[in-house]
């Protein structure tokens, strides 16, 4: 059977070791004779899963003790609403950094609950997309918080700078980059991430919230989105997505076994450098992102002749390179190379790209 590499932007590739372990345990988990999908979320067996997965995540990210970790429903889009409902307090505005599609989506949702101060930081120089440096962001004085997305999956635009905005409450949508390398959690009031890229399967959302920000939710916030309610109930106010939680816990263990986030950072850098080098040394492939803002997780690229796009995708699929079609907004190709994608997968892709150019260039 041909080795398959899944370059989907999400739901994304999961580590094969995790999938194999889940397969082995699926019908008889821990000798119980049942699946982990079938046991009560309030059973001592699942509570052990929940507690261990949180501890492994805390170890990986070195999460300070004054932060709560919440395992939530609803995807990152639910957090677009949860954030203003939980954090505005008596204020009516928040700073929203507009760096691309997902940042703008958060702004659109926030408009239902407050008056966002939208700060457009996108740049385009010589046809290359980029982001203004943080020192040029014009933040307001009275905002409840500052929200930004450090990695835009559609355009492949990244913000590698870490925020240093004094005592401002900073919110980061880390859906596509969390666990791809070390992260100083203490710089943020809230970090949130949908699971389906670097954490686990779709259906789970991670929220890391500083404790002093709890207790400020509006009266009308739905209980399932209230950070204080979720924290007080250990993320079990209602039945959580237990199988997604279990699988995410296996991913956390896998990351620790691989050497942690410093090691993942090295691997991700090597993968991205190989792919970008293949693009840059060719006139056949093109990147539309400025060097300073290229994503390590999502690499869009275009062919010089778009008429060859369908041929490229068809031939790639035939040799096991799946889900390379770019987002409809951008077109072309996109390779998402999250933690679970091995260097061998990227090497197979770049070898194919070189051969495709030789035959069609």
Curated annotation (Swiss-Prot):
Binds 1 pyridoxal phosphate per subunit. Keywords: Amino-acid biosynthesis, Aminotransferase, Cytoplasm, Pyridoxal phosphate, Pyridoxine biosynthesis, Serine biosynthesis, Transferase. It holds the Pfam family Aminotran_5. Its EC number is 2.6.1.52. Its cofactor is pyridoxal 5'-phosphate. GO terms for biological process: L-serine biosynthetic process; pyridoxine biosynthetic process. L-glutamate binds at residues 9, 42. This is Phosphoserine aminotransferase. It comes from Serratia proteamaculans (strain 568). The gene is serC.
């Amino acid at each position: 059977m041909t080795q398959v590499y899944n370059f989907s932007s999400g739901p994304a590739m999961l580590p094969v070791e995790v999938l194999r372990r889940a397969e082995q345990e699926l019908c008889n988990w821990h000798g119980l004779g049942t699946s982990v999908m079938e046991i009560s979320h309030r059973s001592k067996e699942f509570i052990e899963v929940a507690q261990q997965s949180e501890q492994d995540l805390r170890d990986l990210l070195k999460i300070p003790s004054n932060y709560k970790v919440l395992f939530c429903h609803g995807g990152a889009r639910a957090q677009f609403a949860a954030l203003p409902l939980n954090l505005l307090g008596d204020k009516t505005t928040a700073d929203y950094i507009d760096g691309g599609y997902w940042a703008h989506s958060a702004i659109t949702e926030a408009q239902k609950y407050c008056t966002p101060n939208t700060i457009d930081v996108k740049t385009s120089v010589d046809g290359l997309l980029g982001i203004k440096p943080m020192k040029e962001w014009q933040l307001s004085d009275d905002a409840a918080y500052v929200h930004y997305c450090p990695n835009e999956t559609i355009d492949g635009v990244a913000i590698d700078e870490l925020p240093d905005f004094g005592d401002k409450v900073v919110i980061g949508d880390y859906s596509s980059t969390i666990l791809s390398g070390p992260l100083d959690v203490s710089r943020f009031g809230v970090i949130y991430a949908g699971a389906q890229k670097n954490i686990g399967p779709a259906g789970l959302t991670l929220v890391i919230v500083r404790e002093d920000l709890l207790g400020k939710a509006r009266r009308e916030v739905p209980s399932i989105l209230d950070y204080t309610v979720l924290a007080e109930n250990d993320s079990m106010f209602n039945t959580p997505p237990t199988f997604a939680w279990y699988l995410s816990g296996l991913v956390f263990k896998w990351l620790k076994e691989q050497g942690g986030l410093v090691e993942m950072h090295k691997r991700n850098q090597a993968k991205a450098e190989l792919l970008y080098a293949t693009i840059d040394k060719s006139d056949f492939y093109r990147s539309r992102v400025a060097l300073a803002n290229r994503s390590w997780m999502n690499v869009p690229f275009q062919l010089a002749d778009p008429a060859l796009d369908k041929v490229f995708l068809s031939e790639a699929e035939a040799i096991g390179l799946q889900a390379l079609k770019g987002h409809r907004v951008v077109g072309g190709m996109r390779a998402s190379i999250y933690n679970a994608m091995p260097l061998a997968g990227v090497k197979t892709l770049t070898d194919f790209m070189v051969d495709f150019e030789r035959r069609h260039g």
